[in-house]
Amino acid sequence: MNAYNLQKIGITERGDAGIDLSWSSKMNSVAFAIIITKSVNDKFIKELLKHKGKVILHATVTGYGGTVLEPNVHDYKWSHAQVLKLIEAGFEPAHIVLRVDPVIATTKGNAVVDNVLGLFEDTGVNYPRLKSQASKAKFTRFR
């Protein structure tokens, strides 16, 4: 790796890094990477652990997985179990951002966010990121 590559940052912005693992073969050409997925599956965990210390994981979790809103996404309890599996295998919780998406500005939507955040409290993940479908001003309680 040359000096230029030591300054390069990778990010998986297209597709889902938990499904398309092609990012793994490019890790030697970057200093570190931000890996984004809705699917922290077992194959993904295996690949991610090869690069631990060199990646920040953005684990997108929805409280609507398996519903009409997110029919092809795992529910948040599955995601929680998989994130715990990743941490128990040696991945640092400090290198994980919990992305709660979508946040719907309704009483039920707030309850969904509370359920997701509450379940993930035992993981040691301290960086939640909420993607609101409404103005940020309506979510002052999350600041």
Stretch-by-stretch model annotation:
Residues 2-143:
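Conserved AdoMet/S-adenosylmethionine-binding subsite of the radical SAM
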